[in-house]
Amino acid sequence: MLFRSPVDLREVTIALSAEAVIGAGAAPASEAASRLADLLDSGAALDRFRLLTERQGGDPAVVDDPALLPRAPFISEFPAAGSGFVSRIDAREVGFAAVELGAGRRRAGDAVDPAVGFEVLVRVGERVSERQSLVRIHARSEEAAGRALDRLESAVALSDSPPAPAGPLVWKRVAGR
């Protein structure tokens, strides 16, 4: 079974990867994105990910069975305080909350806990109801989840009306090629 990603994640991943391919001289700009899409669609990219996982000492079976990944012992939900539209999700603040859980580093030598983190369950522009879960928090303890929840409360905003449509995912190429 091939991994299926949200369309927007696929789009930005291909755009960023195409820049690397072009920069390395592996393909001209006119072909890079379509070659990468073919690698994703054929499963070749997933095969390469399995190989890289194994060569870095990981278990390549997790690619096909994510249940083998470490699990956080405490899972909680961040519910909407009211009804409305998700008008903002501050990625920077979500990132700080993730570091607070141990999913990121404060300093280069810090360990990263692969079992903790967030599942963001809604998108900007989505209509939500009061108490609907917006984010699922995977933490080592109830206290850690509470600290993350405090940060998430300032990261997610709701409004009574839908936000303006977002612009394109890729605004422009800086590489200049």
Language model features by range: what are they?
Residues 1-177:
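Well-ordered secondary-structure scaffolds
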